[in-house]
């Protein structure tokens, strides 16, 4: 257990998970999409509230609600805990065919609020995921002396409707 994390199966109601997975825009779309291509890999993201269809909008609203954030705080012990209503680093994240992301650290200070980003929630919504594609999230221990990842401790397969919640620090590889 290299850092605090929680794996949650069946995160959403199954029908909501199926329906929201169909709301994603096409990977090649250019409307309200930010494309990342660099040393960590290639992906497309969208965090524009105006672009989200109804169910996606509702789910993000629920995830950012005081009730849900209070529940996360109680479960994780993180206090105070604030939602990121601007979805900086959040929203839809998509990889194309053959896509991958290299091991990296997420930024830990929010660019607008200057608050520490403390928790990260990833929800996998690829209903037809095939384990042969790879794509597992790897959790690594931290080498304190070198400030780099040390040993792979765990892999989390991106199974449909599985969420992983984890501590976002400069040691959470």
List the model feature ranges, each with a label.
Residues 1-76:
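Non-heme Fe(II)/2-oxoglutarate
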Residues 50-172:
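Catalytic core of non-heme Fe(II) oxygenases with the double-stranded beta-helix
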């Amino acid at each position: 257990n290299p850092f605090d994390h929680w794996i949650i199966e069946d995160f959403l109601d199954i029908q909501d998970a199926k329906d929201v997975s169909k709301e994603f825009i096409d990977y090649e779309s250019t409307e309200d999409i930010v494309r990342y291509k660099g040393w960590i890999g290639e992906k497309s993201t969208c965090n524009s509230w105006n672009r989200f269809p109804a169910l996606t909008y509702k789910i993000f609203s629920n995830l950012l609600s005081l009730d849900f954030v209070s529940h996360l705080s109680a479960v994780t012990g993180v206090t105070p805990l604030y939602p990121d209503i601007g979805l900086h680093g959040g929203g839809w994240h998509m990889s194309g065919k053959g896509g991958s992301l290299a091991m990296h650290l997420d930024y830990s200070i929010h660019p607008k609020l200057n608050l520490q980003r403390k928790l990260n929630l990833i929800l996998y919504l690829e209903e037809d995921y095939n384990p042969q594609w790879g794509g597992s999230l790897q959790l690594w221990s931290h080498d304190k002396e070198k400030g780099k990842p040390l040993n792979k401790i765990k892999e989390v397969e991106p199974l449909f409707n599985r969420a992983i919640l984890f501590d976002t620090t400069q040691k959470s590889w």
